Design a protein with these regions (language model features):
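Buried hydrophobic core positions in alpha-solenoid tandem helical repeats
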Residues: 23, 51-55, 84-89, 121-125, ...
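Eukaryotic acidic, Ser/Thr-rich intrinsically disordered low-complexity regions
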Residues: 245-286
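Charge-biased C-terminal accessory regions appended to nucleic-acid-, cytoskeletal NTPase
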Residues: 35-42, 54-56, 73, 87-89
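Single conserved hydrophobic/aromatic residue that forms the stacking wall/gate
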Residues: 1-8
Length: 286
């Protein structure tokens, strides 16, 4: 990369200079060496010891989870079930909370390889209360994969004590009950701007679970959410939960996201309700 950019940047006359030619050759050798090292690193299978070393090196840095992603992917892509169990054990026995959080990352539900935590989830439920934000978040990511009454109760307790900042709303995606609507509505109603992760959780909860009482929650999330992609699924969730107000559908015709515009057009076209029905909801359509 350096050789090509330098070669292109220098005039041809300069490239005839012995000093410049030597510099170009040196940079080329260095670049080739880096490429060989990277290729070898990609071929070599990452071990749990490697992950431990990388995690400990990143623990004091900013955004360590993001920096750990490549190594995690390479490990999880080739790891056997036995190796994943060994990694889970290593995470539970790790004393440094940030390192433990990084080692739990491969078991998060949002990963592409979908490898649920293979051991007892009780320690994860304890970690979800951690004051170490990264550890609490990693534990909740892992717990999202499971449907369990204990997880529902944990989600409610975390939301009541720590609010939406606890990331516990995600635990209701699989563990939602209709009695949760009041709690969710209270938390959403207090939010001026709905963070992206909350939009994601609301859309997933109500796209999966139909609730006639969800419309106020969805309307507030639609109005105050910051992500256009999530807004599309909030509108879909409204439709699933009983109907989309015509006023909202009209707004959606001018949404920046083309799929939202198309969805609104289809609903309006298929509905018997026209522009004079501004205060009404478009009926649930199959």
């Amino acid at each position: 990369i350096y050789t090509l950019s330098l070669h292109d940047a220098l005039p041809i006359s300069s490239l005839r200079s012995a000093a410049v030619k030597a510099l170009v050759d040196t940079l080329k050798i260095r670049s080739d060496g880096v490429n060989l090292f990277q290729a070898e690193a990609k071929r070599r299978k990452i071990t749990i010891d490697d992950l431990l070393q990388i995690a400990r090196g990143l623990a004091a840095e900013e955004r360590p989870r993001l920096k750990m992603t490549g190594s995690i992917y390479r490990f999880a892509k080739k790891a056997s079930d036995s190796e994943m169990r060994d990694l889970a054990h290593a995470a539970l026995h790790e004393e440094h909370e940030t390192v433990r959080a990084l080692l739990l990352k491969p078991f998060g539900l949002k990963t592409t390889w979908r490898r649920p935590f293979p051991l007892d989830i009780s320690p994860l439920m304890e970690y979800a209360w951690s004051e170490n934000t990264l550890l609490a978040e990693s534990a909740i990511d892992c717990l999202e994969a499971f449907k369990d009454k204990r997880i529902h109760d944990l989600a409610v307790q975390l939301l009541e004590r720590k609010g939406l900042g606890s990331f516990a709303l995600a635990l209701l995606i699989r563990n939602y009950r209709k009695i949760d609507d009041d709690l969710i509505a209270g938390l959403i109603g207090k939010s001026g701007v709905i963070p992206h992760h909350v939009q994601q959780d609301i859309r997933e909860i109500y796209c999966r679970h139909r609730s006639a009482d969800a419309l106020p929650i969805l309307l507030h999330t639609y109005r105050r959410g910051e992500c256009a992609f999530c807004r599309h699924y909030i509108v879909r969730a409204m439709h699933r939960c009983g109907g989309v107000p015509m006023k909202i559908l009209k707004e959606c015709l001018y949404d920046c996201y083309d799929e939202t515009r198309d969805f609104a057009k289809r609903l309006i076209k298929r509905s018997s309700i026209h522009s004079e029905g501004d205060g009404m909801n478009v009926r649930q359509l199959s």
